[in-house]
Regions:
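Donor nucleotide-activated moiety binding/catalytic core segment of transferases
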Residues: 192, 196-199, 204, 255-278
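A short beta-strand/loop micro-motif in the catalytic core of glycosyltransferases
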Residues: 170-177
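Acidic anion/phosphate-binding donor-loop and adjacent secondary structure
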Residues: 150-155, 200-213
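Nucleotide-sugar donor-binding and catalytic loop/hinge architecture
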Residues: 1, 101-104, 133-136, 207-218
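Catalytic donor nucleotide-activated moiety binding site of glycosyltransferases and closely related
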Residues: 140-148, 179-184, 223, 230-271
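Aromatic- and Gly/Pro-rich donor/ligand-binding loops
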Residues: 7-14, 18-165
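Conserved acidic residues
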Residues: 104-107, 171, 217, 276
């Protein structure tokens, strides 16, 4: 079955890249032919919300001692082109509609990642509910996320009504966070199921080709939002193991130590190796 995957432009977000990779591999394993719809954004037209998001990430890295590496964009682009099946670049909503008509996808999957946050789509903000698809194309949302505890970026009641009507045409809708079930009902009037993120849905074998064993197995903590509770858990692990777990940004040399053979040329792959070598 020919399946299109419609998610946020991948930019340099390794989490977004990995979820797209994982979902495409799961679909291939089920015997389908997936293609990620290759949304391309002109830097001058990135949404204010997404620019703020990228700036916040950069500031967080700077404050934590991480250095900006201009090769990161090249590395992530290389990973995407080599490991995720892509369509031709799509630069405008008109191009998007034309591509889907040409490819004749039998199914288009919305997700994963924060696809229910339309401002993150920039020029494609009005497309997240897949209203551009022909009537005979099956629509599915998998592990979609609102990116928070409320709907952001839709203030016009008419726009909200139009997107709700589009989402009502979906054969199935699922969300990444438990709160998303309630938000989907309140915001769009649709029923949604709570499911695994694609990175956890896939078997570990899809990551094996990127991984190499480190000389030693050590503790590793990946904390999105540090809190007293998470710090207490880390301290407990420190007492049990006799050393503090490594954390991204907390220790500059963390990637080098965990990759076994030095820093991998592709930092996204380095991250995978870190998780594998625990």
């Amino acid at each position: 079955m020919k399946i299109g995957i419609f998610t946020l432009p991948l930019v340099n977000n390794y989490g977004g890249i990995l979820q797209a990779y994982a979902l495409s591999r799961v679909l291939v394993g089920l015997g389908h032919e997936p293609r990620l719809i290759n949304l391309r954004l002109q830097r001058s037209k990135l949404s204010i919300a997404y620019i703020k998001f990228l700036v916040a990430c950069a500031l967080k890295k700077e404050l934590c001692g991480a250095k900006f590496n201009p090769s990161y964009e090249r590395d992530t682009s290389e990973f995407v082109s080599e490991n995720i099946p892509l369509t031709a670049p799509v630069c405008t909503p008109a191009d998007l509609k034309a591509l889907c008509e040409k490819k004749r996808f039998e199914v288009v999957i919305l997700g994963s990642d924060q696809v229910f946050r339309p401002s993150y789509f920039a020029d494609f903000a009005d497309c997240f509910s897949l209203g551009f698809l022909p009537p005979n194309c099956t629509r599915i949302a998998y592990a979609a996320s609102f990116g928070g505890d409320r709907l952001c970026g839709l203030k016009n009641p008419a726009d909200l009504k139009a997107h709700a009507a589009n989402l009502a045409k979906f054969k199935a809708i699922s969300v990444r966070e438990r709160d998303g079930v309630k938000l989907a009902r309140e915001c769009f009037g649709v029923d949604a199921h709570w499911v695994l993120d694609p990175t956890l849905l896939a078997n570990k074998e899809i990551y094996d080709k990127f991984l190499s064993l480190a000389p030693q197995r050590k503790g590793f903590a990946y904390i999105l939002d540090p809190s007293p509770r998470s710090e207490a858990a880390i301290e407990l692990l420190k007492k049990q193991r006799g050393e503090r777990p490594r954390q991204p940004h907390r220790h500059k040399s963390m990637v080098k130590r965990y990759c076994g053979r030095g820093v991998c040329a592709n930092r996204l792959i380095s991250r995978l190796r870190i998780f594998h070598n625990l």
